Amino acid sequence: KGYKWEDMRDAFLQLCYDGVSFVTIHFTADLDLFSRANQIRKIPVTSRGGGMVLYDSRINNRTQNIFRENIDEIANIALKHNVVISLGTTFRPGTILDACDSVHIEETLRQLSICRLLQSKGVKVMVENIGHITLDKIATHSKLLSKFNAPIMPLGPLPTDAAINEDHIAN
């Protein structure tokens, strides 16, 4: 039932041996944010990978998700194999109605904390973030993102909801 760390670690190691450049990991797929997102959002979770981590946390009664529980080992593996960690975003807004809400901001702050922790261990990091945001909120959110000393990988079309379910075309 759920994931076993040994299996996840072995899959991560295999990717490293195969020569991948980066791996996306959802350290911020937290049940407290999920609970809040369910209460206030139109689309609570936008990430399939993050959703799987949330499901695992729920069925295994984890206080921290499987990746956060093993962050030190993940950092050591990434450092040893020169693999960049891409901080996945489980709660990026899937609609402009959820843009810059308390869940989005809190996840971004948690990503910032994890980014700094990994960088302090020598790990290279990039950050997935943004999602669907209206033009009037881009500057405010950009100020928060400017606190990262890491590249930002924007996901989702910033100023439009005109192509819902067609991000691959609208971007």
Model-identified regions with their sequence ranges:
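Alpha/beta enzyme core
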Residues: K1-N171
